[in-house]
Amino acid sequence: MIIVTGGAGFIGSNIVRALNKIGYQDILVVDNLEKGAKFVNLVDLKIADYRDKDDFITSVRAKEVLGNIEAIFHLGACSSTMEWDGQFMMKNNYEYSKTLLHFCLKACIPFLYASSAAVYGGRTDCFIEEPQYEKPLNIYGYSKFLFDQYVRKIWPKARAPICGFRYFNVYGPRETHKGSMASVVFHLDKQIKAGKPPQLFLGSEQFKRDFIFVDDVAQINLWCWQNQISGIFNCGTGHAASFQTLADTVVAYHNSKPVQYVDFPENLKGCYQTFTQADITKLRTIGYDKPFKPLDEGVTHYLDWLNHQ
């Protein structure tokens, strides 16, 4: 059995889909369906069972027998960079992850988990997986940063692979439930279909991010699991593109009105990453040599999915 926490979410459900594609169906999805919209991400997938995240971690703490587990992909977390409830964030992202990590260590189960490019904070270069380059700007980034530090201390004692992925700007199918935290592609497409002009923040031609298609993210996860890799790795393409470039692709796809620019929100000043670009040297060094989907192809693929479901 393979366990995917956050398996009804964006990246989690795409990992389940990738596992299905290589023949795995004995999959336990762990998630929180309090907001039920995420169920649509599971409808076309083959899984063995579903458990609520709180019930599942209670079973883990009680040392209940959960069966023969081949791996745990831990995607379950609060991923909102706008959430400032530190107690909630640390309990949900940090403490939950530690409990699951120790369960895997004791049972010698490969543990693959979601970190984030948010650990790098406001820097504009050297996005390298080393402590000296890490300085998060928000409590979400700090929760991921702190767990990465915890993992680094654990590695010398680990008898099974522990692999963390620092996701940059992931976009693609199955993110509808994320609302305001969904990708810019999703929001621009939604605005245009509603008959509204697509909107970007003023200065978006200068705001650049490393955008990676979700299928590429899923493939990196599976490859690292299959090759028993341990480490913390950037999960981006190594190339930055502006939000303006992204918007131009969406506008051209729809042949829509030009972009309308809005003032940059006051509440984001000082806690917003204006530039990210993954250094993927470490990922390539371990042998991952697959190409990444070019941005224009990925955006077009995603728009086709959004408009022809």
Curated annotation (Swiss-Prot):
Binds 1 NADP(+) per subunit. Catalyzes the interconversion between ADP-D-glycero-beta-D-manno-heptose and ADP-L-glycero-beta-D-manno-heptose via an epimerization at carbon 6 of the heptose. Its EC number is 5.1.3.20. The active site is at Y140, K178. One of its GO terms (biological process) is carbohydrate metabolic process. Pathway: Nucleotide-sugar biosynthesis; ADP-L-glycero-beta-D-manno-heptose biosynthesis; ADP-L-glycero-beta-D-manno-heptose from D-glycero-beta-D-manno-heptose 7-phosphate: step 4/4. It comes from the Bacteria. The gene is hldD. The keyword ATP-binding does not apply. Substrate binds at N169, S180, H187, F201, L202, G203, S204, R209, Y272. Its cofactor is NADP(+). Homopentamer. It is an enzyme of class 5 (isomerase). NADP(+) binds at residues 10-11, 31-32, 38, 53, 75-79, 92, 144, 170, 178. PANTHER family: ADP-L-GLYCERO-D-MANNO-HEPTOSE-6-EPIMERASE, NUCLEOSIDE-DIPHOSPHATE-SUGAR EPIMERASE. Keywords: Carbohydrate metabolism, Isomerase, NADP. Belongs to the NAD(P)-dependent epimerase/dehydratase family. HldD subfamily. The keyword Transmembrane helix does not apply. This is ADP-L-glycero-D-manno-heptose-6-epimerase. It catalyses: ADP-D-glycero-beta-D-manno-heptose = ADP-L-glycero-beta-D-manno-heptose. It comes from Hamiltonella defensa subsp. Acyrthosiphon pisum (strain 5AT). GO terms for molecular function: ADP-glyceromanno-heptose 6-epimerase activity; NADP binding. Contains a large N-terminal NADP-binding domain, and a smaller C-terminal substrate-binding domain.
